[in-house]
Structure formats: C-alpha cells, structure tokens
Amino acid sequence: MKRILIALVAVLVSVCACQPGPEKAAPADIAGHVIVIGLDGWGTWSFEKGDTPFIREMMKEGSYTLYKRTVLPSISGANWAAMMNGTPAESSGIIGNNAAPYFKPLVLTEHNAQPTFFHLLKQARPEAETGVVCEWGDFLNYADTLCLDYFQRIQDPEGHPDAIVEESVKYIKDKKPVLCFIHIDALDHMGHAYGQGSAEYYAELPLVDDRVRRIVEGVKEAGIYDDSIIILTSDHGHEGTGHGGHALNEIETPLVIWGKGIRKNHEITETVIQYDLAATVAEIFHLDKPQSWRGVCIPVFE
C-alpha cells in the first residue's frame, strides 16, 4: 500500500511540474511616450557660444553628451536613418540623401524597408500611435511611412518658421503619440548659407531653442509630459558651409534626453553613436532589437 501511495504522489508531482505556470506580466514601459526632436545641422562646435537657455536647462533636467558621433558619411540621410534603423551606412546602404539605398541593405522588412524603431513598435503594438512632422521632405524616405499613422512635411519652412511648432503641437495634443519624431531644419540652412561660426547661424540658435521649448510646452498641454521621454538630437555639424566629411566639426553633435526615469544633471561619458538612439528607444518600450542592429542602449536610466 505504501508503495502505491508513493507512486501516486510521484505521478501527481510530475503532472504538476508539467503544467504551465502563471504567465509573467510584461515589464512596464519606462515611459508611455517618446518624442524625438531632431535639429538638422546642430554641431557641438556651436554649443559653447550658442544662446540656448532652454536646452541648457533641460541638460540639468536629464542626461546629455556633446560628443555623440555621426555615422559616415556625415550627411543627413545616412544619419537620420541610423537613428531610426539602428545600423551604420555600410549595413543600410544609405550613404546619401537619395530615396533609395545606394546598394542592397543587409536586412529588409515586409515593407521592403529597413527595420526602424517605428516598425518594431508597430509589430509589437499595432494600436500604438506613431508620427513624423518634418521640414525636410526626404526625411520621410528613412522612416518607413507604412509604419506611421501620421506624417506631415512642412511646406516652405523658411517662409513659415513657426509652422513646425504649430503642426507638432497640434498633432501631439490631438493624438498623444506613443512615438513621434519632429525634424527642424533651420540651423542647417544657416550653416549652408553662411557657414560654420557665422553670425547668422548663431542668431538662429535662440530661435530654434525657443521652438523646442514651445514643442515641449505642447507636450505638457497634452497632459503626457510626466509619462514622456524627450530626446533632442542632431544629424551632423558643419565644416565651413558644408558637411559630409570626417572633420570633428562635422561628426560631433549633442544629445540631450530627459523625462520619466532619466538620470538628472548627468553627463554621459560612454561612447554614443547615432544608431544608439534606436536601441535606446527600443529599450524604453522593451522591444526586441533585430540582430542586424548595431546600436546599444545609452546608459541614461535611473
């Protein structure tokens, strides 16, 4: 009889061990919303003399580096793409500002596009609101618009410099996006027209600083600021009136990140390259990174 009881107990233990346990809850997002603001042509060389009171205040509110490196070549297409697709140009094939890659990318999605952070988010959560508001129309070539619920290019941004603020704030207040990328082109215009270190470039900096401030005010008015992370970044600097080479003035750019769960008044001392931005956004939403990505999460979280 004792042997029978022992055998029954063994069977019960075995059956219980084979039963699936309670599913583990998915970890909560670090923040519910990410707003990326890209300042085209904002080089680190301009920071010391630049009049940017709001940006400097946000550096105290979050984490920052003045030494983020571009991918090469130091042009807009390759670098905005790297921030979204997590890869360098030799992998993505995006070595210029053309709509199509110059050579076949190593990895393509079902959209025949690079796997961007927009794609990762939509794969995991199809209902998540995603959007882009940009002043440079070619920016949309690298975002995978099939993964966007909203995209708007500002027409004649030089003639209507406040339109980027108005459109961005309206979208944020109306839709409260989970992931949004806003592109501001004014500094690049000044760099090309008047050159690195020009009075005209420096005069534009406080105007751009104020546009960033007003967009952030819009995030607050939308009621999502306390559950948001805001990332301020740039694609390249300038050398003279151009870029595309490998001078430090072209390849060093600032990065500022602040908001929910971000370390305050923290200077990032680790190496940061453009494609690390994609990995950091993926970490915020606990998205699985593709094997093709080369970016690593920037250590800015509390």
Feature-to-residue mapping (PLM):
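Structural recognition of the beta-strand scaffold that forms the well-ordered cores
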Residues: 34-38, 65-68, 82-84, 120, ...
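Catalytic-site neighborhoods of secreted/periplasmic enzymes
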Residues: 92-96, 102-105, 109-161
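Sec-dependent signal peptide recognition
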Residues: 2-8
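Active-site nucleophile/metal-coordination loop of metallo-enzymes that catalyze phosphate/sulfate
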Residues: 25-31, 43-123
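Metal-dependent active-site segment of extracytoplasmic phospho-/sulfohydrolases and closely related
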Residues: 35-36, 54, 204-248, 281
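Substrate-binding rim/cap in mid-to-C-terminal beta-strand-loop elements of soluble/periplasmic
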Residues: 84, 246-288, 299
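Active-site His/acidic residue clusters
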Residues: 138-152, 169-210, 214
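Bacterial Sec-dependent signal peptides at the C-terminal "C-region" and cleavage site
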Residues: 8-30
